[in-house]
Amino acid sequence: MRFDSNGYSADYVSAFEYSTNGLPIILAARDGALSEALDEHIERVLAEHNSDKVNIACHSLGTAVCGHYLNDQQRAAKVNAYVALDGAGGTGPDTTCPGEEGWRAPCLGIFVDPERTIGPNNVHLPDETHVQAATSAASFAAQFEFFTGEEPTTTDIVVEEGEVAISGRAVYFPANEGANGSTLRVWEIDSDTGERLANEPLDSFAIDATGEWGPVDLVTGAHYEFELQRPGRATHHFYRQPFLRASELVRFNTSAAGSEIETNTNSGPEHAALVISRDLEWYVDNGEQTDILEISTVSPLQGDQPAFNLITPEMGNGNIGIHVHDDVATPRETTGALLAYFHAQIFQTGADVFMPGDPDPDGYISIVSSPRGDTERKQQLNVPNWASSEHRISLTFNDFVQD
């Protein structure tokens, strides 16, 4: 959206998505197994825009995927410029852009570690983190200038007033395969309680193997629920902060039937289960910049639960997804103890929090984030207290605070 805010049409931005469902698949991606699929994606983009070359930005494992792609002369010839975001690179003065001599696309490395480089052009963001280095305003500014030769006019996301078109995919995580056979319904909600404002959804989309849904016209600044109905399974409810601009790249990650995510989530008719995510690592032990993430529940039937800050040093600073539910060991009690399975997953952790719930919600759950400990610029989402026996809840906070 920052590119679009600076006149770089959103139609020119596309995502190449692939599976990371298990170590063998990850290792295959690292070793070049996706070069043909990436080439097909690039060919589609070139044909769509009647162009000869693309710019590509690749993050983390994606830098290995793109590095293998660029090692082929014919494929490298389709790339105008390449940005490597905190992934493959080296140390010292002799690192080079991927590819063969005479066929290398110009490259830019953006790294957290000030010792890492890739070729002659590098930007170091030592005060940022691995995921943040792909999404931050500073990273965007470096990418934009490298691709266009000009500094961006703004690093803010410029708000579009009124209705904007929103679309994307509903996919099984981490396979990135479409949630085939499900239905996505879109509701406008009360920002104070998460309650739906109408008896019928604004729109509804049948999800096929592509996972694609939309577009739907939504009002910037308004709050919405995206309800993914999964036949024979718990309904998955997605909530996020209000949209600021049109987007074709909204993703809803759900779990496949019988997945380890599903089997390790303790569910029941009297408590809620949710996942909180943000494309910025949660700082759990970083002095005054430690994040605060408080959860409270209003439940007339079961009793209110006071605000509890689930951020603890034991979580570690490298996570972007936090699973939250009442654990088996201490039912109806909030201890904040780590949920062992989720804490063992890369970029994820989990905490024991009792949030009273009901299949027919009797109240709501408030989740309040103070990014980097800044209590003057809080972010808040309020959602119905759906019981986990029949429902799952996912919340996405912005990785930025913008006045």
Where would I find each of the regions flagged by the language model?
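Post-His helix in hydrolase/transferase enzymes
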Residues: 132-144
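Beta-strand-rich structural segments
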Residues: 164-172
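Beta-strand-rich domain onsets/edges
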Residues: 144, 148-164
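Generic structural signal for bulky hydrophobic/aromatic residues embedded
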Residues: 41, 143-147, 171
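N-terminal non-catalytic accessory region
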Residues: 1-57, 61-84, 152-153, 172-403
